[in-house]
Amino acid sequence: MSGESATGHPATVAVITGAARGIGLATATWFLAAGYRVALLDIDGPALKAATRALKDPSRAIALCCDVSLQPEVEAAIRQVVVAFGRIDSLVNNAGVAIFKPLLETTHEEWRRVMAVNLDGPFLCTQACAPVMLRTGGGSIVNIASISGLRASTLRVAYGTSKAALMHLTRQQAVELGNLGIRVNAVAPGPVETEMARQVHSPAIRADYRDAIPLARYGTPEEIAATVGFLCSPAASYVNGQVLAADGGFDASGVGLPTLRRKA
């Protein structure tokens, strides 16, 4: 069955957005190691091509430059995936952007851009990929959300709201597509050692996160990728409509960060 094939099956195909770096690239690497053929999509064409060339088996991967917020680009990219591989078994909606500003300083243009990428993108990619999955019996979709969608904090009005909405979109997708053989789940990462985190997390924020997370550390892109891989695997064949927090216990602890409670 499509999307539930045994690890290493030569026919299986995964589409990953935001795949040029970080969690997206780690996820592409995971799928390749599991025997999938992989389509890597990203808006940053040069970085995407360089990342794809550096993969261990680039012959089983294609790189497609795509802005997931634009329907024509999404549809064109998925058509190219079908031409190259003939099918799609898994879709990982990872592409995302963030604006870290107080509510009253966030412009409407910034708000709309975050919503366009973080929410419209998964909607459009699902609409484009799901019909292809149905041709071979179904598949699996994983949306990359965030603990910022589970908890509110300052400076995340657009980002946090977009991720909370993505979690509900996940449930809507799961309910509507489940009967068709497509499972949909979300992963809500906690702090992860990515380039974006290194740029926006000050030493004080990093120290507070380590103090608030029971495992006392940031996660790695590879750990998030393995979580995504599990949700796309036969081991998760009865998991549908769930949001899995991969956060070292941060959400369970209920401890906030003083550095993110400053006055806006």
Residue ranges and their predicted role:
Residues 126, 162, 170:
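Active-site helix of classical SDR
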